[in-house]
Amino acid sequence: MKLIHKLEPLWWILFGAGGFVIGFVLPALILGVLLLGPTSLMADGLVYHRAIRLASSPIGKLFLIVVPTLGFWHCAHHLRHFALDIGGHGAAALGAFGSYGLALLGTIAAVAAVLAL
């Protein structure tokens, strides 16, 4: 059995968790930060010192790592299956290594950026 098939449950877990994050958490984050933040509905909610304090806390750092990382893995799984649909089994390995490699690079970049806070 190929390694990619042995790791398939891991990819599906990351895909499902990423789908949840993209479907539920990201729209709420966009609503809160981009739409309600500039209005008076969240008075002093997004001032700099409160935002940096939240981002520097352990829960904030975990949130800033988990949300983009799971989104990367969700998109990587979609890209892998897209490559499989377009190129057949000949492009499956390249699509898998390419998409999951990009997701891994995105994960490393997200962790490095958050740890630099």
PLM region descriptions:
Residues M1-L117:
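Membrane-embedded alpha-helical bundles that constitute the cytochrome b-like, heme-associated redox core
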